[in-house]
Each structure stands twice: as structure tokens, then as C-alpha cells.
Design a protein with these regions (language model features):
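Short, surface-exposed secondary-structure boundary micro-motifs
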Residues: 20, 34, 70-71, 89, ...
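Short, compositionally biased
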Residues: 42-48, 78-89, 145-166, 185-200
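N-terminal accessory targeting/assembly segments
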Residues: 1-104
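C-terminal amphipathic alpha-helical interaction region
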Residues: 540-589
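P-loop NTPase catalytic core
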Residues: 221-222, 228-554
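P-loop NTPase nucleotide-binding/switch module
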Residues: 97-153, 170-229, 244-247, 282-301, ...
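Short alpha-helix capping/helix-loop boundary micro-motifs
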Residues: 13-18, 49-54, 114-125, 159-164, ...
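Metallocofactor- and cofactor-centric catalytic cores in central/energy metabolism, strongly enriched
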Residues: 45-48, 70, 156-160, 234, ...
């Protein structure tokens, strides 16, 4: 018989039940006659506290709350990819069929299509010994992704006593029957459930060794993130957080993208849907949506579901990691998630900490980011979850609690700068405030897969940009004319780096995504120009003479003029620089 409780008090999304209802912490409950989905978040002094994931307007004291004896969970099986869910894994397409354009309260739909038949290849046979994570079946979920159904992590070693034949099955039909060590049997289907707040177990965590290549030069070259890494993208209004995440979602070399729209504008999720349904994945040649799952919990959706959406997304990512895939999560934005925590904390009358955020903000953020990593799974495969979280500090103030606490738990910080964005320099990631702690870990990969000179070139580029920053302090006061020519040259080369390398056009066919070899080639050309120009300056040539030639502007435009698939053209540019060098020498003696 279901456990029940009676509503005693209501405070926005938080409701109180009087007496001992027999509920457990984190248990999923149905609230009121419309069966609104809720979660038990507090048990004390004969009072049960429940947060409701839907609008509570119209609820009244005396109505019934029914327990389910299960934690808030997601259904894991074929059909997740190429789908769009709300914060508690309800498919928005199915909800639209039932309730139209606006989500009705208490709408009940299956998370995944339970009627659809999938072509299944069974990978175990009778008598096989299986353990947690063992792959029991494979299904072609989309053109790009093979879905691997696994023994749940909470089942220890067992024996297969019955295995279905290859064929068509829905996600709930039993395909394998196991005999457990205690003699009981357990039927397994294509789908399984897992609580969203509990990380899926793994065998071993690997140190970072491979970069998540995004095709964005400032990220891949200056501030790389590793597969299984964590990054924060903080920035004020209009600095390009969402656009940066869209670019990473489109072009990163992850196998699967989980895009969580957490408390942001609905039209941004619409843009992702529209773009990804047309874009072709350069790796597979198939549609981007064939490797993407969207979780839409926009700013006008209930605040409690916003808090849950982050955990829903990371649980889906861990499931695909267990199959051996590299998964990247885009969380846009963790600030809205933290605001949801703050609102719920206020409703619960908890003691506020800095700026009204709850005292446990740091532990909640760490619990989220710690679920990233490159792992050896229980079944022996290797997979990764990379988390890239946007942060929206009010007024672009990076000293506020969400940004500061996030910096403690991420190893990559891509700080967006308002002045760069207003100057139309995109991505507006500032090279002086950003950093990556993965560079040392990834150096062996760069040396082996790109060039032994890659990291030294990158360090030289950063040194020039730092010198420019120091010189600009003087230039702002007394102008650049008073500088010696070697410093004028540093400013000119830094301009070439900023405009020709760091600035990137997301709407240009050649520039939207740039392979690592081209990024290295561009660095080499810029530094070769610097080397030759410095040799001329050391011979007494003024920078004004060097600028009479258009070579600096030509090098800035190589990002457009050199196709991504024809890097041989870099040799021509090197010859042009040599010609420029010899011409200046002849002309000026």
C-alpha cells in the first residue's frame, strides 16, 4: 500500500506535511489531485518537507501526497539521443502532443518511448558470467551512436540463465534473465533506472592526457581543456557565453553532447534546436542532433526543476560514458541553478551566507563538477565526461560567490570580457584573466600529435600578449610614438595575434572550426614574421618602414585565405615573408 501524507502548509514550490508519513529523503512523491511531481528534501520533528517540480498554484492544505518508494530517477535506454527533455526527463515533444504549446501541470508521459521497437543484437548467451556494467545488448540508437545496454552497477556477479535472440524489442521487454548469487532471478530489459543525485560508479579515474579539441583557437591553443576536464565560462550580459558554448557543442570532438539550458532564455534553446537540426557533424557526416540531447529548463519553468536539471544531465552523460563514449556537458548557466538553490533555501528559512546564497553552495557545486573525469568503467571500457559550465555573474563581477566557488573546482577558466565583446572581438575570452591548469598534462599529446614546437610557440604567443599589456599602460599615457622600435614591433605583432589568431568568426565556413594543424601553422607563420621583422629592426629599420608593406594585413587574413584542408599554402606565406624581408633590406640598404 502506498504511503501518504496530508499537506499542512505551502510556500511557493515548498510544501510541508504534518506527522510521520513514512517517506524517505530524496523519495519521489505525487502531490495533490493533479499528481504534481515532487521530492522529499527534509524530515524533522514530525514534519516532512517536499519540493515540487511544477507550479503549485491551486494546491491547498488537506490534499494528499502519495509516495512512490523510489528516488527521483532517470530512465536510461535507447531514445535519449536526438531528444529534448525538461529538467526531470519528460520529453517535451510528447508533452506538446498532450497539452499543446504550454506544459500542463501534472502531465504524465513516459521519459522514453516504451512502444517503439528497436533492432537489438544480444551480446551474451546462456551460461555466461556477467558483472556490473557488462554489455548485454547493442542497438543502433541513431546513425552516429550504437547504444550498449548494460547490467546495472548495483548487480554483483551473476549467471545468464536465459538470453533472448536477436530481434526487435521495446525498452521494457525482458531480453536477459540472470541468476543472482542468492539464487533469486532478475530480468533485464534495454532500459534501467538510476537516481539522479547518485554518481554512477566507476573502476578507476585516469589523469588528464587528451585535449577536448573544440576548433576554437584561443581554447585549443592557449587554454585547453582535457577530455574528462572541467571548465567555467563566466561573463556579463552580452559577452558571448551562450555562443561560446554553442560553438563547443557544435565542433568539439566529443562523441555525445548533453546541452542543459538551465534557467536561460527559451529562444536560445530554440536556436540550438534549429542549428543542430541542419548542421553536419564533420566527424561522421551525419546530423549534429544524431549525437545530441537537449535538456530545456528555461527561465519561465518552475525553479525546483531547474535545480534538478543539472543532475539529470550529468546522469545521462555518465550512462553514455559507461558505454565507452566521450561525453561533453554544456550547462548554461550554473548561476541560474545557484539562484534556484538560493530561492529554495530562502523558502526553507535556512541561514543565508554571502549574497543570500546557501552555506552549502560550494559543496553542491563541487558535487556537480566532481562527476566529470576520464574513467575506466566497471566493464573495462574507457569513457569521459567533460563539464563546461557558463557562469552569469551580475554586472560581470567575478568576485561574486558563484564565480569564486566555481573557480575552486574547475581547472580551466575562460573569462569573458565586456570590453572585448563591445569591440566586436569574439570569442571575447580575455587572455590575461583566463587560465588552464591542463596545459602541462596535455604537453605530451601536443608534442606527439601536433608538433614538438607547439607548446613553446604557444608560450611565445602568450609572452608577446603579456608584453603588449605592459606597453599599453605607457601608450595610454603618452602615445606609442615615444616607444623604441622593438617595442613598437611587439605592439604590431600583438595586433596580428589578436586579430589574426585569437579573433574567430563563427559564421565563416573556414574559420568557425579550425583543426589543430592549421592552428599550429598560423602560430608558426606569425612567429616567423616576428622573427624576420625583429631582425630588420635590429639592423636599424624603423617599424614605419616595415608597415609600408601590406604583409601584416595579409598574415591577419590567413585564417580566411588558407583552407582547412590545404595547409600547403603556409609555405607560400613563408616565402612571401622572405621576399618582404629581402625587399626591405635592398630598398633601405
Amino acid at each position: 500500500m502506498s504511503k501518504t501524507g496530508i499537506i499542512y502548509g505551502i510556500n511557493g514550490p515548498v510544501i510541508y506535511l504534518k506527522g510521520d508519513c513514512g517517506f524517505k529523503i530524496s523519495e519521489m512523491v505525487y502531490v495533490g489531485p493533479e499528481k504534481l511531481v515532487g521530492e522529499v528534501i527534509g524530515l524533522k520533528k514530525g514534519m516532512t518537507t517536499v519540493q515540487v517540480f511544477e507550479e503549485t498554484t491551486g494546491l491547498k492544505p488537506g490534499e494528499t501526497v502519495v509516495g512512490t518508494d523510489n528516488a527521483i530517477s532517470v530512465l536510461l535506454g535507447p531514445g535519449i539521443i536526438h531528444n529534448i527533455f525538461d529538467g526531470i526527463q519528460r520529453p517535451l515533444g510528447e508533452i506538446a502532443k498532450q497539452s499543446g504549446k504550454y506544459i500542463s501541470r501534472g502531465v504524465s508521459v513516459d521519459s522514453l518511448d516504451t512502444e517503439k521497437k528497436w533492432d537489438v543484437h544480444i551480446t551474451v548467451k546462456e551460461g555466461d558470467i556477467v558483472g556490473p556494467g557488462t554489455i548485454i545488448a547493442e542497438t543502433q540508437e541513431t546513425v552516429s551512436i550504437v547504444h550498449k545496454s548494460m547490467v546495472p552497477p548495483n548487480i554483483s556477479e551473476a549467471t545468464v540463465i536465459k538470453a533472448a535472440k536477436d530481434g526487435s524489442y521495446n525498452i521494457l521487454e525482458p531480453i536477459v534473465t540472470l541468476e543472482l548469487p542468492d539464487g533469486s532471478t532478475k530480468e533485464l530489459a534495454l532500459a534501467q533506472k538510476w537516481p539522479i543525485r547518485i554518481p554512477r560508479p566507476t573502476h578507476h579515474r585516469f589523469p588528464a592526457s587528451t585535449p577536448l579539441v573544440t576548433g576554437q583557437r584561443i581554447l585549443d591553443t592557449l587554454f585547453p581543456i582535457a577530455k574528462g576536464g572541467t571548465a567555467a565560462v563566466p561573463g556579463g550580459f552580452g559577452t558571448g557565453k551562450t555562443m561560446t558554448q554553442h560553438q563547443i557543442a557544435k565542433w568539439s570532438d566529443a562523441d555525445i553532447i548533453i546541452y542543459i539550458g538551465c534557467g536561460e532564455r527559451g529562444n536560445e534553446m530554440t536556436q540550438v534546436l534549429e542549428d543542430f537540426s541542419k548542421l553536419i557533424d564533420p566527424k561522421s557526416g551525419n546530423l549534429m542532433m544524431d549525437r545530441t540531447t537537449l535538456i530545456a529548463n528555461t527561465s519561465n519553468m518552475p525553479v525546483a526543476a531547474r535545480e534538478a536539471s543539472i543532475y539529470t544531465g550529468v546522469t545521462l552523460a555518465e550512462y553514455y560514458r559507461d558505454m565507452g563514449y566521450d561525453v561533453a556537458i554544456m550547462a548554461d548557466s550554473t548561476s541560474r541553478w545557484a539562484e534556484a538553490l538560493r530561492e529554495l533555501s530562502g523558502r526553507l528559512e535556512e541561514m543565508p551566507a554571502e549574497e543570500g546564497f546557501p552555506a552549502y553552495l560550494a559543496s553542491k557545486l563541487s558535487a556537480f563538477y566532481e562527476r566529470a573525469g576520464m574513467m575506466q568503467n566497471l566493464n573495462g571500457t574507457e569513457g569521459s565526461v567533460s563539464i563546461i559550465g557558463a557562469v552569469s555573474p551580475q554586472g560581470g563581477d567575478f568576485s561574486e560567490p558563484v564565480t569564486q566557488n566555481t573557480k575552486r573546482f574547475v581547472r580551466c577558466f575562460w573569462g569573458l570580457d565586456k570590453s572585448l565583446a563591445y569591440a566586436r572581438h569574439f570569442p571575447a575570452i580575455h587572455w590575461l584573466t583566463s587560465y588552464s591548469e591542463y596545459l602541462e598534462d596535455l604537453t605530451p599529446w601536443y608534442r606527439a600529435n601536433v608538433s614538438p614546437k607547439f607548446v613553446s610557440d604557444r608560450n611565445q604567443i602568450m609572452a608577446i600578449l603579456n608584453q603588449e599589456s605592459s606597453l599599453m599602460e605607457i601608450v595610454k599615457l603618452i602615445g606609442s610614438d615615444v616607444l623604441p622600435d622593438d617595442q613598437k614591433l611587439t605592439l604590431e605583432i600583438a595586433r596580428v595575434i589578436r586579430l589574426g589568431f585569437l579573433q574567430q568568426n563563427a559564421f565563416h565556413k573556414e574559420d568557425t572550426c579550425v583543426p589543430m594543424k592549421k592552428q599550429f601553422g598560423m602560430m608558426e607563420i606569425i612567429l616567423y614574421l616576428y622573427e624576420k621583422a625583429r631582425a630588420l629592426v635590429n639592423r636599424g629599420m624603423p617599424v614605419s618602414v616595415l608597415k609600408e608593406d601590406n604583409i601584416f594585413e595579409r598574415i591577419i587574413s590567413i585564417k580566411y585565405d588558407v583552407p582547412n584542408d590545404n595547409l600547403e599554402l603556409f609555405k607560400q606565406y613563408k616565402e612571401d615573408i622572405d621576399t618582404f624581408y629581402n625587399k626591405v633590406l635592398e630598398k633601405n640598404g
